[in-house]
Amino acid sequence: MSEDIFNSEFLLAGTNKVLRNRSVLAALTNKQSNDDGSLTEEEIKWLERRAHDGFAIITTAAAFVHPSGKSWSGELGVHSDEMLPGLIDLAGRINSHGAILSLIHI
C-alpha cells in the first residue's frame, strides 16, 4: 500500500517544523490591504480561514518591498516596520491552526 504523501505529515526541509500535509495556498492577488499596504482585518481573517480549513502553508498576496514598488491599490506592503504588527498578528493566527506563513514579494 502506498503512502498518501499529500495528506501525511512531513518535516519542512532545513527546519524542525512538521507540517500536517503538503497543501499550499498559492499567492493570489486579492487587493484587500489598506492604502498604506498594511493588512486589513478582512484579509487576515480570509487567510486564517484557509489555514483553519487545512492548508499547511499560506502564501500571502504579492507584496511590495519599497514604496515605489507598489503596483496596485490594495497591494500588501512589507516595506517598513509599520507593517510588522499586522504581519505578526497574521503569522500568529496562521500558526494557531498548525500552518505556516510564506511571504511573496514582487
PLM features: what roles do these ranges have?
Residues 20-23, 55-56, 92-101:
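Short, well-ordered coil/turn segments that N-cap beta-strands
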Residues 41-44, 48, 52, 85-88, ...:
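Amphipathic, non-transmembrane alpha-helical secondary structure
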Residues 59-83:
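Glycine-rich, proline-tolerant flexible connector loops at the mouths of alpha/beta enzymes
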Residues 45-65:
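Catalytic domains of carbohydrate-active enzymes, especially glycoside hydrolases
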Residues 30-41, 75-78:
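Active-site mouth loops of central-metabolism enzymes
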Residues 76-99:
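Alpha-helix-loop-beta-strand connector modules within alpha/beta enzyme cores
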Residues 2-24:
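N-terminal amphipathic alpha-helix/helix-capping segment at the start of soluble metabolic enzymes
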